[in-house]
Amino acid sequence: MVIKAQSPAGFAEEYIIESIWNNRFPPGSILPAERELSELIGVTRTTLREVLQRLARDGWLTIQHGKPTKVNNFWETSGLNILETLARLDHDSVPQLIDNLLSVRTNISTIFIRTAFRQHPDKALAVLDSAREVEDHADAFADLDYNIFRGLAFASGNPIYGLILNGMKGLYTRIGRHYFSSPEARSLALGFYHQLAKVCEGGLHDQVYELVRRYGHDSGEIWHRMQKSLPGDLAMNMR
């Protein structure tokens, strides 16, 4: 196990998470006692206690007063906030993880974009208007794309969609910086934002579904061609 961390707490957190991932502490098992675990990792019990509380909040563990700490099945108990951690733990699975992430984005955005256009068109157009002045480089487009989808999610009037996008932010923007290094990807995105604005202005709500699905398909094709050049550090240094 190779762990890179800058603090005792960071080291302890990575040690426990990687031990859960590698089944040293499998789901359903009980963690070693606090004294034993702190000695095993090489941190103070105070530091360990803080780390365990944080991991419990993220869904990795269940802590109950007077009972041993239990390892959870994190797929069932954690939220989107662990996406970056999963990508870091298993780089070989990053392409599939990203495919799943983009599929979720497409599926839910067909709903919240249509709702935003129908119920709050002025807010939606204000979000889309931000694409007019974007600088032509990957970082700017990665931020723009995330902020447009997030902005439209909140413009729908249902903040839960926005919270879902918040949970995707870290991995989403890292993907975006690689994806939008392609001029073709940047051009496709600008065309998509422009088409969305026209649909919103025209009140053509029923066209949203097909427009978003087509963009998901076309951007997916570009992404799959780029996967061969996926940088090895895409999922690294997430902390």
UniProtKB/Swiss-Prot annotation:
This is Fatty acid metabolism regulator protein. Homodimer. Gene3D superfamilies: GntR ligand-binding domain-like, Winged helix-like DNA-binding domain superfamily/Winged helix DNA-binding domain. NCBIfam families: fadR_gamma (TIGR02812), PRK04984.1 (NF003444). One of its GO terms (biological process) is regulation of fatty acid metabolic process. Keywords: Activator, Cytoplasm, DNA-binding, Fatty acid metabolism, Lipid metabolism, Repressor, Transcription, Transcription regulation. Multifunctional regulator of fatty acid metabolism. One of its GO terms (cellular component) is cytoplasm. InterPro entries: FA-response_TF_FadR, FadR_C, TF_FadR/GntR_C, Tscrpt_reg_HTH_GntR, WH-like_DNA-bd_sf, WH_DNA-bd_sf. It comes from Klebsiella pneumoniae (strain 342). Residues 6-74 form the HTH gntR-type domain. PANTHER family: FATTY ACID METABOLISM REGULATOR PROTEIN, TRANSCRIPTIONAL REGULATOR, GNTR FAMILY. One of its GO terms (molecular function) is DNA-binding transcription factor activity. Residues 34-53 bind DNA. The keyword Transcription regulation applies. It is found in: Cytoplasm.
